[in-house]
Curated annotation (Swiss-Prot):
It comes from Conus regius (Crown cone). Pfam families: Conotoxin. GO terms for molecular function: ion channel inhibitor activity; toxin activity. Belongs to the conotoxin M superfamily. One of its GO terms (cellular component) is extracellular region. It is found in: Secreted. InterPro entries: Conotoxin. Residues 1-20 form the signal peptide. This is Conotoxin reg3.10. Keywords: Amidation, Disulfide bond, Secreted, Signal, Toxin. The lineage of its organism: Eukaryota, Metazoa, Spiralia, Lophotrochozoa, Mollusca. It comes from the Eukaryota.
Length: 76
């Protein structure tokens, strides 16, 4: 009887806990896979937007300074 209890405990408690940990890893892998399939042109646009920074003013409205009083990085 004790052996059957141990087997049931392993099958009903420990095995599901082990599989839940594996399920938690899948969304991260899917996200990384989606990033790899990104078009290189789209990836460049994302990087360029990040490199421009927060203080960049809109080129059409540029008067040489951003709202924080610093020099614009996009229009000099």
């Amino acid at each position: 009887m004790l052996n059957m209890g141990v087997v049931l405990f392993i099958c009903l408690v420990l095995f599901p806990l082990a599989t839940l940990q594996l399920d938690a890893d899948q969304p991260v892998e899917r996200h990384a896979e989606n990033k790899r399939n990104l078009n290189p042109h789209e990836r460049r646009e994302i990087i360029m937007l990040a490199l421009r920074g927060v203080n960049c003013c809109h080129p059409n409205l540029c008067i040489g300074r951003s709202a924080l009083g610093r020099k614009c990085t996009c229009c000099g």
